[in-house]
């Protein structure tokens, strides 16, 4: 089964590109906030342990299906060894892994942070001031862009999508990896 792992900083467009990629492939989208938002709603706070358990169940059950594969989006802090461990653990469950790193200028990401699609799918981002501050803090406190040679996957593509529409980026991914 295939895994297309879409990584990048906050509001870079991981979910939106994943949505577009799902439209043009037989892959299913599992974006990071599909587990985060219900947990915040139910527990009234972020609970990483519960989010992780739910993700694990989704992966376990999805791998039992006859789907072609999954698009999974996640923010990877390259200065956090635990993030690398998690990404490798997820990737190990799949037969084929394709890693796409999206990068975009901070000014563009701050604008994307306010888009209707993002706010419709991610209730935790609707307090725009708090969401913007989280985005800036994440960037200040973590390295969210890989260094050359740091991505441990043979099938890797970095795309600067600062000026690219999500459907164009999805087409680039599909073409590069013959999805």
Task: Describe these PLM feature segments.
Residues 1-4, 67-68:
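Pre-Walker A (Motif I) flank of P-loop NTPase domains
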Residues 6-8:
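Hydrophobic anchor at the beta1->P-loop junction of P-loop NTPases
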Residues 13:
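Conserved glycine(s) of the Walker
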Residues 16-63:
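Conserved substrate/cofactor phosphate-moiety recognition/catalytic segment
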Residues 50-106:
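Glycine-rich phosphate-binding loop used to anchor ATP phosphates in small-molecule kinases
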Residues 55, 59, 166-174:
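Short, amphipathic alpha-helical "lid/cap" segments that border enzyme active or binding sites
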Residues 106-113:
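Switch/connector loops and helix/strand junctions flanking conserved nucleotide-binding motifs
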Residues 119-169:
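Small-molecule kinase domains that catalyze NTP-dependent phosphoryl transfer to phosphate-bearing small molecules
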């Amino acid at each position: 089964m295939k895994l297309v792992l879409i990584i990048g900083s906050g509001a870079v467009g991981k979910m939106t590109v994943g949505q577009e990629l799902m439209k043009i492939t037989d892959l299913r989208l599992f974006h990071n906030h599909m587990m985060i938002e219900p947990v915040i709603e139910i527990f009234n706070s972020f609970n990483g342990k519960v989010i992780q358990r739910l993700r694990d169940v989704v992966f376990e059950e999805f791998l039992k299906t006859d789907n072609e594969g999954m698009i999974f989006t996640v923010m990877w802090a390259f200065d956090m060894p635990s993030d690398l461990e998690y990404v490798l653990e997820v990737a190990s469950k799949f037969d084929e892994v394709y890693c796409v790193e999206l990068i975009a200028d901070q000014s563009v990401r701050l604008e994307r942070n306010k888009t209707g699609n993002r706010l419709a799918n991610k209730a935790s981002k609707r307090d725009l001031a708090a969401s913007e501050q989280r985005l800036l803090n994440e960037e200040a406190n973590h390295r969210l862009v890989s260094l050359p040679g740091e991505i441990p996957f043979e099938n890797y593509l970095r795309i600067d999508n600062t000026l690219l529409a999500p459907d164009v980026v999805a087409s680039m991914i599909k073409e590069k990896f013959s999805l």
